[in-house]
Design a protein with these regions (language model features):
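Mobile amphipathic helical/loop "lid" adjacent to a hydrophobic cofactor/ligand pocket
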Residues: 5-118
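Secondary-structure transition/turn motif
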Residues: 21, 29-30, 180-185, 283-287
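Active-site rim elements
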Residues: 67-71, 132-138, 217-220, 289
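Helical element adjacent to the flavin cofactor pocket in flavoenzyme catalytic cores
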Residues: 120-182, 186, 190
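Conserved FAD/dinucleotide-binding core of flavoprotein oxidoreductases
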Residues: 127-139, 197-202, 270-289
Length: 289
């Protein structure tokens, strides 16, 4: 770790879900898996005893019994939307407790794998000891993560090339790779392709020596998911006191998140203090194509 003590992270008080019909809070839940789900179910106003009696119990238990192999075998061919329909949650409960997390995967529910959704719900609700109120970075990621990571990697002997485009791969001498770039080529024993879908498809398409036809077909079949919109606003006045730093939304059109950055990190806080304004970011996930 670049920061073994994780000193750039700070806890948040809550991750509220804001809707036109009422809000949901995740503050005060126990961190113990399953007990947190039980307490949330007990205290939410969107689920009553009669509602719980109508819930599809086997489908709901799939969230609590996540097993990578078994879950993907059973649910990977089911869409997230179909799975959420099968749960038979009341509309308000689905909107506040499930829709926000499903949508934050940046995939439309009609296209997303139910197994992927279950994996995410498992992590948030039953596998994460921090529960649903998470830590946030108290400074920009550039200062908190990427610059320190670069310094550490260079200290360990790694080379970092900024602003260099990888164009293609070629295998030479049996077990050596040459990475063709827009500058000088690089040689390596192993190469990891970690880029966005259009980038990896372009590199693989231009590469020689990648003779696994099935793998090439899998790469060619990759699709780019729907767009994720971010609108950062530098306001000339402060937002209302008590606003959460990070809040999910549901039932308000395409808006999925409102972040008040001076409540999260030091750079925005300094700007807000200096100007008397506020730094607000609005997110919209999985926008229609």
């Amino acid at each position: 770790r670049v920061d073994p003590e994780l000193g750039f992270l700070k806890p948040t008080d809550d991750y509220p879900i804001l809707t036109p019909t009422g809000n949901e809070s995740f503050a005060g839940l126990t961190h113990a898996p399953l007990f947190n789900v039980a307490k949330l179910t007990w205290r939410t106003e969107t689920l009553g005893i009669r509602d719980l009696m109508k819930v599809n119990v086997p489908a709901a238990l799939a969230m609590l019994r996540f097993d990578f192999g078994a879950t993907y075998a059973a649910f990977d061919q089911v869409t997230a939307g179909a799975y959420l329909d099968a749960l038979n949650f009341p509309p308000l409960a689905r909107q506040r407790l499930l829709h926000v997390f499903a949508h934050s995967c940046f995939n439309p529910q009609a296209d997303m794998s139910a197994a992927d959704l279950l994996q995410m719900l498992h992590f948030y609700f039953t596998a994460n000891h921090d529960g649903l109120v998470f830590d946030v970075a108290d400074r920009p990621f550039s200062r908190g993560i990427f610059q320190p990571l670069g310094v550490l990697l260079e200290r360990l002997g790694a080379g970092i090339r900024m602003g260099v485009s990888a164009r293609a791969l070629e295998r030479r001498d049996g077990d050596r790779w040459v990475v063709e770039t827009d500058q000088e080529p690089l040689t390596a024993d192993l190469v990891v392709l970690a880029t966005e879908v259009p980038g990896v498809k372009a590199i693989v398409g231009a590469s020689r020596g990648l003779d696994d036809a099935d793998w090439r077909r899998q790469v060619d079949s990759l699709r780019v998911t729907n767009a994720f919109a971010v609108w950062r606003l530098w306001l000339d006045r402060p937002v209302a006191r008590g606003r959460a730093g990070f809040a999910g939304t549901a039932g308000v059109g395409p808006l999925d998140n409102i972040s008040v950055y001076e409540n999260l990190e030091d750079e925005s806080r300094a700007w807000a203090t200096r100007t008397g304004g506020s730094v607000v970011e609005l997110h919209a996930y999985a926008l229609p194509a």
